[in-house]
Amino acid sequence: MTNDIHLAFAHPVERAAASSDLPYDRISLRDYTVEVEIGAFQQERGTLQRVRFNVVVEVLPLTGPIDDDVDRILSYDRVTEAIGVELQAERINLLETLAARVAERILLEPQAERVFVRIEKLDRGPFSLGVEIVRARDGQTPAAQEHVEVPHPRVVYLSNAAVS
């Protein structure tokens, strides 16, 4: 159990190394920080905040020689481009949405088999807040939860004069 807890909060590279029996190679992007307007709360609207990305992409090993040819591998710039494209597409409220979209875009790359995406907000307090997801090419997510419709209440403020 202690090892499970350690891995749950370990860096994605360490977790990826311990979580698969398949002979994957891993490409990692660590501590990629950008400023972006993101957040569901009113105080986050119109304000840039720093967001840090850590991404690990598992790829099947090449069957032939690499020949020092960038076109034979999944290049790091494809990972940063996936992040950039999703950040520029539209304003997003939730880190969960952004992480899922980045993962989906990375999995469009033919070499990518599985991707770990961790995103953290760095400016919401003296700590970091974040989300971490795992997605695989086959569409399977570990312990995927089935979609449950949840209520979305609307809150309306009415002054005393309005209700009298």
Language-model segments: residues:
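N-terminal, polar/charged subdomain of small-to-medium soluble alpha/beta proteins
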Residues: 1-164
